[in-house]
Amino acid sequence: GIAAAWGVVLAARSGDDLPTAIRGLRASRPTAVNLGWALNRMQAAMGAAAPVDVDALIGVAAALQQEDRLLTQRLVDHGVSLLAQGCRVLHHCHTGAIATGGVGTALGVIAAAHARGLLRHAWLDETRPRLQGAALSAWELGCLGVPCTVIVDGASGLLMRRGEVDAVMVGCDRVAANGDVANKIGTYNLALVARAHGIPFYVCAPGSSIDRATVDGDAITIEERDAEEITHARGMDVAAPGAQVWNPAFDITPAHLVTGFITEFGVLRPPYREVLSELLLPNQL
C-alpha cells in the first residue's frame, strides 16, 4: 500500500493521468487488500480540484508510511509475547522491514525475539517460485545477526516431525470476515502440516489487511503469474518443452487452521468472525 501511495506521487509529479495510474496500480495486485486501501486514501486527498496538489499527496503518502511504522511496532510487541525462551520459529515468504514502512510483521517478530534473547533459531522457507524467503528474508535476518537457515518449502514437514519448530509465523495479503487468510502460495500447506504436528500457526495481520467486506476465502481473487516463473531459473529453461504450468501466487488458509492473528490491536483468538467484526479498522473508518 505504501509503495502504491508513492507511486501516485510519482505519477502526479510526472504529469501522468492520475485516474489511469491509480487504476493500473489497483489492478497490479488484486489479492492484497491494503493496496486498495492506500489508493483510496490518495484519491480522497486528490479531491476534485485541478491541478492536483502534489504536496498534499506527498503528505498523505508520508503519513501512511509513518502510521505503518508505528502499527508494525505494536504488532511486533504483541507477537513477541507469544514466544518462549529458546523458541524456534518457521517463516514463509518475506514480511520484513523492506516489505513495510517499519520493522516488518512476522519477520519483525522474529527479529525482535532475537534482540530480546528469546529466539534460538529461525527457519526460512525458500518460498518458490520467486524465492522471497531465500533472497530477502535470509538477507534481512543476516544483516541483523539472527541465526537462520533456509529450507526448501517441502522440508517443513520433516523439520516439524523432528521437533525442530515451536511456532510458525507468516504474514498475509488479505483476511476475510470469517478469518480465512490469503497469503503467499504454500501457506495453506504449511498450516496443514503445523496442525498435524500440534504446532501453533500464527498470522501477522495489520488492520489494513483485514477485509470485512469479503465474506470468506472463496471470494478472494487469486492472482496468477507468468509460467516462466516456474519453467525458468536464472534465465535458464528447466522444464520439459511444452510443459503446462499453473502458477497461482497465493492460496487460502481456512480460519480453523489459524491459532491466532497477531495485530496492532493485540492477539486475536477464535471465534474470528465475531472478533474481527468488533475491530475498528483503518480501512473502514
What are these regions (language model features)?
Residues 1-49:
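Long amphipathic alpha-helical segments
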Residues 25, 29, 60-70, 95-99, ...:
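Flexible, glycine/proline-enriched loop segments at strand-loop-helix junctions
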Residues 34-90, 120, 124-168:
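Ligand-binding beta-strand-loop-alpha-helix segment within the catalytic cores
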Residues 73-77, 105-109, 150-152, 183-186:
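Active-site glycine-rich loop that binds ribose-phosphate moieties when present
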Residues 103-115, 191:
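Histidine-anchored nucleotide/phosphate-binding helix
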Residues 119, 125-285:
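Conserved phosphate- and dinucleotide-binding cores of soluble alpha/beta proteins
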